[in-house]
A protein has these predicted regions:
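Primarily a LysM-type cell-wall glycan-binding module
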Residues: 246-275, 328-329
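Solvent-exposed, acidic/flexible segments
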Residues: 86, 90-101, 110-113, 132-140, ...
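LysM (lysin motif) carbohydrate-binding repeats in extracellular/periplasmic proteins that recognize
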Residues: 267-295
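Substrate-binding/active-site groove segments that recognize
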Residues: 135-156, 168-171, 175, 199-202
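Short, functionally critical alpha-helical segments immediately adjacent to catalytic or ligand/cofactor-binding
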Residues: 113-128, 188-194, 282-284
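An acidic, Gly/Ser/Thr/Pro-rich helix-cap/linker signature
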Residues: 2-112
Length: 329
């Protein structure tokens, strides 16, 4: 074949291919669904990473945070961003708060401890019976030796660190003693995390007695800011990107209590007598560490029994409707 013929065939081939490509593109434009662009534009508008403007005034236990100081401001911003973008963990904290904060609030009020201290439990344990690698346990992360020193029963059968009411009372006693020592609630709260000894040492070394002016261990330095970040997110979740339906919040446990001061050999049988099961009994009484109880001499235990219908989601939905109606009045 001569070179001119080859060039002619090659040119024809290229032209044919170009025409096919142009026709294909034209066809794709005809069938193009513009709604897909709209959907992507909407999604891009809804979700994007951003920073959050701090409120003009932020307090912890009615004590003002010095947000005019850049280091204070940046520390709070760090914890807010951490909370806002730890999606699943923070959602669970908000959902648990609906169940447990009423319990904690009542005990704080009874002891004249500021209401903001309830957010320390979120910083400590995310409102769960967490166990740290060091052995700190429960909502308030109490070490075994510290709990025993304050009269808590802690053994392989009963561990009162898992009891929300008793551990919150323990925390209140600590807060009050620390407040008496330091004269302000912010340092009292910080000492719960770092220990009074460590806080005292840094006060002596640095000649400062203001939490925001002290250089403390990283965990204690972040502690108050973390609690305040949870306070902001829990009280206004939608602003921080958490849209949670009321019915998705964990309901409060409904129960009544029975007094026990004698041996219980089998909590499964015990539960059946009250129309429930061991699983529900343990859910309400996580401080019972064994399926039996050998009580201490002259000690009475209050065991929670689920009220009728506590487990039903229908009751939860009805309660949420009542809450919304009350809220709208």
């Amino acid at each position: 074949m001569t070179n001119p013929n080859r060039k002619t065939i090659l040119t024809a081939f290229i032209l044919t291919g170009t025409i096919i490509i142009i026709l294909s593109i034209a066809q794709s434009f005809k069938s193009f669904d513009r709604s897909q662009v709209v959907v992507h534009q909407i999604l891009d508008t809804i979700y994007y990473i951003k920073s959050y403007k701090l409120p003009e005034n932020v307090t912890f236990a009615d004590e003002k945070m010095p947000l005019d100081n850049f280091d204070t401001r940046e520390s709070l911003e760090r914890e807010i961003l951490t909370s806002a973008y730890r999606h699943s963990s923070t959602i669970l904290i908000i959902m648990r708060a609906h169940r447990y904060l009423p319990v904690i609030e009542k005990i704080l009020k009874k002891n004249n401890v500021p209401d903001d201290f309830k957010y320390l439990a979120a910083a400590e344990s995310e409102y769960s019976n967490m166990v740290s690698p060091a052995g700190a346990t429960g909502f308030w992360q109490i070490m075994p030796e510290t709990g025993r020193e304050e009269g808590m029963e802690i053994n392989n059968v009963v561990d009162e660190r898992y009891n929300v009411e008793k551990s919150t009372q323990f925390a209140c006693d600590y807060f009050l003693k620390s407040f008496e020592k330091y004269g302000n609630w912010t340092l009292a709260a910080a000492s719960y995390n770092g220990g009074r000894g460590a806080v005292d040492e840094q006060i002596d070394i640095q000649h400062q007695n203001n939490y925001y002016d002290l250089l403390l261990s990283e965990e204690t330095a972040r502690y108050i800011f973390r609690a305040v970040a949870y306070k902001l997110v829990i009280t206004d979740p939608e602003y921080y990107g958490f849209k949670i339906a009321k019915e998705d919040l964990f309901p409060e446990f409904k129960f009544y209590e029975v007094k026990v001061d004698s041996l219980v050999t089998d909590f499964s049988n015990f539960a059946e007598k009250f129309g429930t099961n061991y699983k529900m009994l343990k859910l309400l009484n996580p401080w019972l560490r064994k399926p039996y109880l050998t009580p201490k001499t002259n000690k009475q235990y209050l065991i929670k029994i689920p009220s009728e219908g506590m487990r039903s989601t229908e009751n939860t939905e009805a309660e949420n409707r009542s809450f919304e109606e009350e809220k709208s009045r």
